[in-house]
């Protein structure tokens, strides 16, 4: 029985990529005896989704750069690269990770709104496909390092188009109050004055209006803005050769709503943009990897507490994973489906599913309908392949979890979990003056 994409229930046991999830934790415990939770990813699904994305936008010849911030696990980067995608990095660390996993200079896109000298130097010295510059002054920094390295760096100016995606405020990036990008008029002036930066190939525009977008309307509005800017810049004698439409493609975390209409959206863009002769770039992240991962966690405790009103008692299910592992519910109010690995017989009833962190925000779901659960049972938090492990922390003195991959029926530990006893390894007592 299929539960979600890549998720099935075989013989009563939940499986990811055909791998029974109870087997995953049992295998991990041979390496990490105390493990009670871990991340699990289906690499075949990652590659299949990357291939599907590339095929959908093939009519435009889109150069797709996978957004490392979604999940930068080396095993995942290798599969994305195998599918023919490039890498989009938002920091020096992500640039280095992309280089380490074999992404060539022309396959690395540098993003971010707080450009550092180290990032600019890397782009000039090591080479990138392009840099998305967030403001005009950044061009001076990029020019300095490109001139010193004796190279030319291609640059796209990020434009804030004033488009509201009507999603969570923390993932809306294209409205007027967002911190990203320059006004369209500023970009037009900079493109016309590109001779000021002779070591830069300043012929691109970058628009990224938000994340977790299920209605393609805002993305198509951004594409219209990009086309209008390219046409106006050409009229001013400064034609553009690169249009980067960013990412933002959402996934249906509820399992009840519509999926992002990827192929239909791609077809509409191809029809409306085909006449614009430029190089196209997109930066998918979440859409590629979120459905391919789960957070697997043991049930530590189940408790019932009597109510103080007519509402009666409340059932709390305490997991071995917490908000330090999967921050999205606490940070964004995000809701993930939570499914028992082995469903016990009995009526489904509401439960508040929480973690062990000493915070009232450490709640995965307040009204999850779940069958009876007991201590030691396993549950899977679905669609956890993006913005999960990459955002985890050691808050509350908790070690980060191991990351396990399923690859064609083979199970591997791709990243070791942290032992709480070794979390002080970075602590020092070193005088910095005197």
Where on the chain are the PLM-derived regions?
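A charged N-terminal "starter" segment
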Residues: 1-153, 197, 201, 235, ...
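Active-site loop/helix belt of alpha/beta enzymes
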Residues: 2, 145, 161-305, 370-373, ...
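Electropositive phosphate-/nucleotide-binding environments in soluble metabolic enzymes
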Residues: 18, 40-47, 51, 70, ...
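Charged (often Lys/Glu-rich) extended helix/loop segments that serve as interaction or gating elements
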Residues: 28, 268, 277-434
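Short, glycine- and charge-enriched coil/turn segments that flank and shape catalytic ligand pockets
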Residues: 59-60, 147-151, 236-237, 256-259, ...
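Structural preference for beta-strand elements that scaffold enzyme active sites
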Residues: 61-65, 84-86, 105-109, 130, ...
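Active-site beta-loop-alpha junctions enriched in small/polar residues
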Residues: 67-73, 90-93, 113-115, 134-136, ...
